[in-house]
């Protein structure tokens, strides 16, 4: 581990919010004062014991952290190779990792005197988490969600409305996460005085990528001590996590970036296959650098620089970009990024249900599909830790449709 910080992977971003050539702060003049105020408030909060005391209390008593690190015995035996551990963040309150970050941002919003919270959501988990925390603190909540995602994630739409949130279906573009984020940014520009934008992933203008990463890093910090307890002080050999924007992955990866023995693998949504048809959301595998939603990163785009829609069975991975820190880790070679198709994710989903009695969300099913590929090729003392970042209740209708199961029976 780099202790002097000179050769550390954990010191970014710089003062301009850049990770190498990625990141930054590409926003309108209207938003810049709010962004700078948010950065100042967060920098102060990072060193404020009262802020972290409140976070720790809510993580423990409201979210239910620490989430378990579970050895998957039947999956390990079935694959016949590496030992597989699942970080059970789907057991958090609201059913995913998203609430880890939402709590931090909304505590900051309250400190800034904001009374209205807006958010974007794809799979609906960030929207549910935001609506949940707003209900707890008595704040107005508006969630932008692509119309296509509203249809395929109906259970989460109902949950958000039960929690008091206004859900705004976005019909522009293909009606997915990118379009929801576009409309949320338009709302923010119009209502800067009383509104706080709670971004759900490690994207957006600085300080969001670093701030969301810091809140999600509770995942990796827990894994360090939990695995040490279960495996006599060992570190994981390989970390695997699914990536849309990349917050659950960054939360798992970041505490291990300066441990060179730990292999780090991010799994993107390969959709119908990563080829010239661009029916996928694998930004690092099939994209190139550009600017979207306030930061420079790898994006799916055409020859003229127009952002492409992408495709994935998973609403939470259906995003044509990726967090800038992931782009930097990709280019430096510290992390590797692969893609998994819809069909492979569906197979992994079913195997996890059958062998471990865990119904995963389609997002971590992509990560699990990669684990299924690599585990048999690794020795039995090799330890893989995969982040089970969400539960699959929200996806049962989508999976049933693809498997040809009639839900009306």
From Swiss-Prot:
Listed InterPro entries: Trp_synth_b_CS, Trp_synth_beta, Trp_synth_beta/beta-like, TrpB-like_PALP, TrpB-like_PALP_sf
GO cellular component, one term: cytoplasm
Origin superkingdom: Bacteria
Catalytic activity: (1S,2R)-1-C-(indol-3-yl)glycerol 3-phosphate + L-serine = D-glyceraldehyde 3-phosphate + L-tryptophan + H2O
Cofactor: pyridoxal 5'-phosphate
Record keywords, A-Z: Amino-acid biosynthesis, Aromatic amino acid biosynthesis, Lyase, Pyridoxal phosphate, Tryptophan biosynthesis
Positions carrying N6-(pyridoxal phosphate)lysine: 98
Keyword Amino-acid biosynthesis: yes
Short name of any one Pfam family annotated for the protein: PALP
EC identifiers of the protein: 4.2.1.20
Lyase keyword on record: yes
A Gene Ontology molecular function term of the record: tryptophan synthase activity
Function: The beta subunit is responsible for the synthesis of L-tryptophan from indole and L-serine.
Record text on subunit structure and interactions: Tetramer of two alpha and two beta chains.
Family from the record: Belongs to the TrpB family.
Matches recorded under HAMAP family: Trp_synth_beta
Protein name: Tryptophan synthase beta chain
Organism encoding this protein: Cereibacter sphaeroides (strain ATCC 17023 / DSM 158 / JCM 6121 / CCUG 31486 / LMG 2827 / NBRC 12203 / NCIMB 8253 / ATH 2.4.1.)
């Amino acid at each position: 581990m780099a202790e002097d910080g000179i050769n550390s992977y954990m010191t970014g971003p710089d003062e301009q919010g850049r990770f190498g050539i990625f990141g930054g702060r590409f926003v309108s003049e209207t938003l810049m004062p709010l962004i700078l105020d948010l950065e100042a408030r967060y920098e102060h909060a990072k060193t404020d014991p009262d802020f972290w005391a409140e976070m720790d209390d809510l993580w423990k008593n409201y979210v239910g952290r620490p989430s378990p690190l579970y050895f998957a015995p039947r999956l390990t035996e079935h694959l016949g190779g590496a030992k597989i551990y699942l970080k059970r963040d789907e057991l958090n309150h609201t059913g995913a990792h998203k609430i880890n970050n939402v709590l931090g941002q909304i505590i900051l919003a309250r400190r800034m005197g904001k009374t209205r919270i807006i958010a974007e959501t794809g799979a609906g988990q960030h929207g549910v988490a935001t609506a949940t925390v707003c209900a707890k603190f008595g704040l107005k909540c508006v969630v932008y969600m692509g119309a296509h995602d509203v249809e395929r994630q109906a259970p989460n739409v109902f949950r958000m409305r039960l929690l008091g949130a206004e859900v705004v279906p976005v019909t522009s573009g293909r009606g997915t996460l990118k379009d929801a984020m576009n409309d949320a940014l338009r709302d923010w520009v119009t209502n800067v005085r009383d509104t706080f934008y709670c971004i759900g992933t490690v994207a957006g203008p600085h300080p969001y990528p670093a701030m969301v990463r810091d809140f999600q890093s509770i995942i990796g910090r827990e894994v360090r001590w939990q695995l040490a307890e279960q495996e006599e002080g060992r570190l994981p050999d390989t970390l695997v996590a699914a990536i849309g924007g990349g917050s659950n992955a960054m939360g798992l990866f970041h505490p291990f970036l300066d441990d060179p023995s730990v292999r780090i693998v991010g799994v993107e949504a390969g959709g119908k296959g990563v080829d010239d048809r661009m029916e996928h959301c694998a930004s690092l595998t099939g994209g190139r650098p550009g600017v979207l939603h306030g930061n420079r990163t790898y994006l799916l785009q055409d020859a003229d620089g127009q952002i492409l829609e992408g495709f994935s069975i998973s609403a939470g991975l259906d995003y044509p970009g990726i967090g800038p820190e992931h782009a930097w880790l990709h280019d430096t070679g510290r992390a590797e990024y692969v893609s998994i198709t819809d069909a492979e994710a569906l197979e992994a989903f079913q195997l996890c249900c059958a062998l471990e009695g865990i119904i995963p969300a389609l997002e971590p099913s992509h990560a699990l599909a990669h684990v299924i590929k690599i585990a048999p090729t690794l020795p039995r003392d090799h330890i893989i830790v995969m982040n089970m970042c969400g539960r699959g209740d929200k996806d049962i209708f989508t999976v049933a449709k693809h498997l040809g199961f009639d839900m009306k029976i």
